[in-house]
A protein has these predicted regions:
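Short, conserved beta-strand edge motifs with alternating hydrophobic and charged residues
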Residues: 111-113, 128-130, 153-157
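ATP/nucleoside-binding phosphotransfer catalytic cores, i.e., glycine-rich phosphate-binding loops
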Residues: 114-117, 121, 146, 156-199
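A generic structural signal for short beta-strands and their flanking turns/coil linkers
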Residues: 106-108, 123-125, 148-152, 190-192
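Gly/Ser/Thr-rich active-site loops/lids in small-molecule metabolic enzymes
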Residues: 81-92, 137, 143-164
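Catalytic core of DAGKc-family lipid kinases
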Residues: 4-125
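Glycine-rich N-terminal segment of FAD-binding domains in flavoprotein oxidoreductases
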Residues: 1
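Residue-level signal for tight coil/turn positions that link beta-strands
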Residues: 57-58, 149, 198
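Glycine-rich phosphate/pyrophosphate-binding beta-alpha loops
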Residues: 66, 70, 128-142
Length: 199
C-alpha cells in the first residue's frame, strides 16, 4: 500500500523473499519457498515484469481478498499461528477449515454485482477474489487466475451445500477441482460490488 502512494514513475520494483507460512504470492511468482538464498538468486537473475494488483475501497492487495467462511478460517489461522507456530501452511489452513465446516454454516448473506451486471443475492460461504490461483498454503481456489491478464478472478458458491458435500469440496480445492461443482462458480472480471447484510 505504501508503494501505491507513489506515481508509476517514482515507484520502485518490488522483490520478495518468501518466508511466510502460506507463501501463495511466491507460488504465483514461481519463487523458491522458504529458501532465502534460492529466492535471492532468482531476484538477482530475474527481470522486472508488470503484474496486476487488486483494490478494495482504498486498500490494495497482491494475491487474495476473501470474504465468508474462508475469511473466518484465515482469521483463525492467524490467531493460532500467534499462539503456536508448530503448525504452518496447508496443515494450519486445513485444520481450521475442518473445524469451521464441522460446526456448520448457513453462509453470509450478501448482494454482489460483477462488472456492472444485475445484482445477485448469495449466501456466501466463499467469496474469494484472486490475482493468482492459490491461497491457504497452496489451495487452488481460483485455478484459472493469472497475475498478468489484467483481470481479477473470483470463486463463490451459488448454494450452501450440506456438510458432507462441503467437506468434499474443501478437499477438492487443493487441486482446484472444486470449480467443477454445479454450486461453485469461477469467473474473470474487472470489478465487483459486494454488500454484506450483516457486519
Amino acid at each position: 500500500n505504501g508503494l501505491m502512494t507513489l506515481s508509476p514513475e517514482e515507484r520502485p520494483a518490488l522483490g520478495i523473499i518468501p518466508m511466510g507460512s502460506g507463501n501463495d504470492y511466491a507460488r504465483t511468482l514461481g519463487m523458491k519457498i522458504n529458501d532465502p538464498e534460492g529466492a535471492f538468486a532468482q531476484l538477482v537473475r530475474g527481470k522486472v515484469k508488470q503484474l496486476e494488483i487488486g483494490r478494495i475501497n482504498d486498500v490494495y492487495f497482491m494475491e487474495t481478498m476473501s470474504f465468508g467462511l474462508d475469511a473466518a478460517i484465515a482469521a483463525d489461522t492467524t490467531k493460532r499461528r500467534a499462539n503456536n507456530s508448530s503448525t504452518e501452511g496447508e496443515a494450519l489452513f486445513l485444520t481450521s477449515g475442518l473445524k469451521f465446516m464441522a460446526a456448520g454454516s448457513k453462509g453470509y448473506p450478501c448482494t454482489v454485482s460483477f462488472d456492472g451486471e444485475k445484482d445477485i443475492d448469495l449466501q456466501a460461504l466463499i467469496m474469494a477474489f484472486q490475482i493468482g490461483p492459490t491461497y491457504g498454503g497452496g489451495f487452488k481456489v481460483c485455478p484459472h487466475a493469472q497475475p498478468d491478464d489484467g483481470l481479477l478472478t473470483v470463486c463463490y458458491n451459488t448454494k450452501v451445500p450440506i456438510i458432507p458435500h462441503l467437506l468434499a469440496l474443501f478437499g477438492l480445492a487443493r487441486a482446484g477441482k472444486h470449480v467443477n461443482s454445479r454450486i461453485i462458480k469461477e469467473r474473470h472480471l474487472k470489478q465487483a460490488v459486494v454488500t454484506f447484510h450483516k457486519p
